[in-house]
Design a protein with these regions (language model features):
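Extreme N-terminal cap/leader segments of soluble proteins
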Residues: 1-67, 95, 110, 114-123
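A glycine-rich phosphate/pyrophosphate-binding beta-strand-loop-alpha-helix module
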Residues: 68-131
Length: 131
């Protein structure tokens, strides 16, 4: 497999991002591309709380950091705080990634590193989302 880290997201397109970056990273997560996620862990009827927010671009710009790791952490935190406010425990996050087409795969992967680290710190995972 060739190195794709310097490609821009706009060069790959949504399907290319799913196949090249997201599916290999989240092993078998089918939720990318249909804006939803299947949570196999939910076996019995129960109250389920769902939320999804993207990280506001102006807020990310205020971080003034070229590394998107912290923006990824913030993106996960925004969604986890919505669940906490509802008194819910997270089973997984359905995350919206709103990024310019000029973002490189390497930058996107750093954002994903931040999302994953925040999820791990709170005992959850990325279940799917939208690009």
């Amino acid at each position: 497999m060739s190195d794709t880290t310097e490609l821009r997201l706009g060069d790959l397109g949504e399907r290319g991002i799913q196949e090249t970056v997201l599916r290999p990273r989240y092993h078998g997560t089918e939720g990318f591309g249909d804006d939803s996620a299947f949570l196999a862990e939910v076996k019995t009827p129960a109250e389920l709380v769902a939320t999804t927010d993207s990280c506001p671009t102006p807020l990310v710009n205020l971080l003034a950091e070229p590394d998107l790791y912290h923006a990824g952490w913030l993106l996960a935190t925004i969604n986890l705080s919505d669940l906490a406010a509802a008194g819910a425990e997270p089973l997984g996050l359905v995350v919206n990634y709103t990024l310019p087409k000029t973002t490189t795969v390497r930058e996107f992967e750093r954002l994903l590193d931040g999302v994953d680290a925040c999820c791990a710190a709170h005992g959850t995972k990325v279940a799917g989302g939208d690009i």
